[in-house]
Each structure stands twice: as structure tokens, then as C-alpha cells.
């Protein structure tokens, strides 16, 4: 009986620690264009990321207004386990494979038709106020991408 109670407590603690770790990303983040670098440019007019818990892990929703003023939306749901998940609304990818590195960092590989296009590293600052996304690879136009996007928590 004691072993069973300890096992139940262990599962509860693991579940709670996963939820707390995911909380580092949870919230709404707005692009700070002044602190960001887009190569190739230009930077989007606006980009908002929203991370929220979901029954299947962590849900990312994004709203973009590109440099020409065209609006789009997209996102994915992941367990941050490195497995491919559908990525809607991204011209550079149809799947993503986000994987947790630590409580403040995850890496992501974007693929289009099974071919790697862009790799990303997403880091929440120690104070939880800034999210930095570094991207390298090749976009859907065949251009080399080397972006650093900085977001402020709302």
C-alpha cells in the first residue's frame, strides 16, 4: 500500500514539474522589432506568439503581419518531445519537432515535405520577461535565413 501511495505521489510530482516548466513559455509575446535582426529582411510589421497549456502539451498560436501588410495565422501543439507535429500557417514548414532542452529552452526543427528547412532555438530569459528565437536555414524562397527575433512578454 505504501509503495502504491509513493508511486501515485511520484506521478503527481512529475506531472506538476512538467506543468511548471511549461509555464516559462506560457503567455503572450510580442515581437520587439528594435531588438530583432532579420536576414533576409525586412522584419514583419508585427508578430505575436501565444503559448498555452493544452491536453496534448503546449499549444503555440501565432499572428503575423508581414512587411507588405499581409496577415496570417498559424501554430502547432507539441509535447516538446522532438516528434514531428503539424505546423499550420508557415510557408517554410508543414511540420515542426520541438524538443525541450531545459526549463527555459527548446529547440525546433522545421520541415517541408520531410526536408529540414529551418532550425530554431527558443529561450526564455531568467527573469521571464524576454523570449529570444534564433533561426537558421533556408526559407521557402530559397534564401538563407539567419534571424534573431526578440519578444517581450505581455
Identify what each model region corresponds to:
Residues 20-154:
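Hydrophobic small-molecule pocket/channel-lining residues, especially in calycin-type beta-barrels
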Residues 1-5:
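Positively charged n-region of N-terminal signal peptides that target proteins for export
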Amino acid at each position: 500500500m505504501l509503495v502504491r501511495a509513493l508511486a501515485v505521489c511520484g506521478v503527481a510530482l512529475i506531472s506538476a514539474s512538467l506543468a511548471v516548466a511549461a509555464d516559462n513559455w506560457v503567455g503572450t509575446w510580442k515581437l520587439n522589432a528594435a531588438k530583432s535582426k532579420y536576414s533576409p529582411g525586412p522584419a514583419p510589421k508585427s508578430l505575436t506568439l501565444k503559448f498555452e497549456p493544452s491536453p496534448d502539451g503546449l499549444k503555440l498560436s501565432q499572428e503575423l503581419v508581414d512587411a507588405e501588410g499581409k496577415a496570417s495565422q498559424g501554430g502547432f501543439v507539441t509535447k516538446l518531445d522532438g516528434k514531428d507535429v503539424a505546423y499550420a500557417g508557415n510557408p517554410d514548414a508543414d511540420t515542426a519537432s520541438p524538443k525541450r532542452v531545459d526549463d527555459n529552452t527548446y529547440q525546433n526543427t522545421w520541415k517541408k515535405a520531410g526536408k529540414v528547412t529551418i532550425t530554431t532555438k527558443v529561450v526564455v530569459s531568467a527573469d521571464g520577461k524576454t523570449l529570444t528565437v534564433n533561426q537558421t536555414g533556408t526559407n521557402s524562397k530559397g534564401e538563407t535565413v539567419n534571424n534573431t527575433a526578440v519578444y517581450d512578454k505581455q
